[in-house]
Amino acid sequence: MLASKLDPFLKRFEELNSLLSSSDILNDISKMTTLSKEQKNLEPIVLKAKEYLKTLDNIEENKALLNDPELGELAKEELKTLEELKPKLEEEIKILLLPKDPNDERNIFLEIRAGTGGDEASLFVGDLVKAYARYAENRGYKLEIVSSSEGSVGGFKEIIMLVKGTGAYSRLKYEGGTHRVQRVPQTESQGRVHTSAITVAVMPEVDDIEIEINPNDLKVDVMRSSGHGGQSVNTTDSAVRITHIPTGIVVVNQDGKSQHKNKESAMKVLKARLYEMQESERLAKESEARKSQVGSGDRSERIRTYNFPQNRISDHRINLTLYRLDAIMQDGLFDEIIEPLITHHQAQALQEQNL
């Protein structure tokens, strides 16, 4: 019974209230912060649990009044409303009971690279960057370009962006994979549709404490920054290339004005990549059911097609097709795709958890 599953959460919440109101905890800032965070995480399910248990009590009370000559009709109406509310609350609680992705509240790095299709792929990277920027603005996130390499006719060969905001990872993690674009290039005189592809890698931003890097494992090179077409954009050796020797991961950053800033940004990206590598290894060891969840983030997985002549956008993971490509790209309306992905993910997770 669902009610019995809620009891431990209610007890723990009361226990946390007592602990946080004790005088001992005031002298231990670290413990107080940890307990406050746990309390905040429990609050949504506790509030919903109390509403659900109150609804169950009200149902029983109204059932007892059905034969009452004065209150019977009123109880019947009230019971109908409560019986409709009960399954809705149960579904909301089941979703709240699902295991949380520990990265969901983090900021997220988006690493976008042009793949097959040459210049057309680079141009689409540029278009997608603009669309993501509008999406970030819509949700109140901040977007920073960490590093970039421009395409020869515009757009980007590759770009790394950091999207900052509570829950940024929980939504944009579904963008990881291969994105295919079909459209007529401006240089195409015959009106033929060309197909190109780009890849998006998603990585949560991590703290220094979570990823420790031995300085002896790093090879740091400095060089002159190069601009569009390879020309030097300044006269100082401000560009930084960091190689993580054990894994072979290489990060180059030249977008900042100082060597220090570029090295700092490159280290953030390196830590995110190492964390992503560790997470991928951890997930690979888990059950096939766990791995089947939507959005593995594997950049080799073809997740979406953008067909401009048909104004169509299709997400292949959930067989979703919308004929609103222009609006989604122009206004950054990616929630029209992300929301169904989240719903699908939750449905799969509920099945796996037998909730």
From Swiss-Prot:
Question: What InterPro entries does its record include?
Answer: PCRF, Pep_chain_release_fac_I, Pep_chain_release_fac_I_sf, Prokaryotic/Mito_RF, RF-1
Modification N5-methylglutamine, positions: 231
What the entry lists under SMART domains is as follows: PCRF
Span-the-membrane segments of this chain are none
State what protein this is by name.
Peptide chain release factor 1
Protein family (similarity comment): Belongs to the prokaryotic/mitochondrial release factor family.
Q: Does the keyword Kinase apply?
A: no
**Where does the record place the region Disordered?**
280-303
Q: What does this chain do?
A: Peptide chain release factor 1 directs the termination of translation in response to the peptide chain termination codons UAG and UAA.
Q: Which keywords appear in this protein's UniProt record, sorted alphabetically?
A: Cytoplasm, Methylation, Protein biosynthesis
Q: What is the annotated localization of this protein? A: Cytoplasm
Q: Where is the composition biased (Basic and acidic residues)?
A: 280-291
Q: What species was this sequence derived from?
A: Campylobacter jejuni subsp. jejuni serotype O:23/36 (strain 81-176)
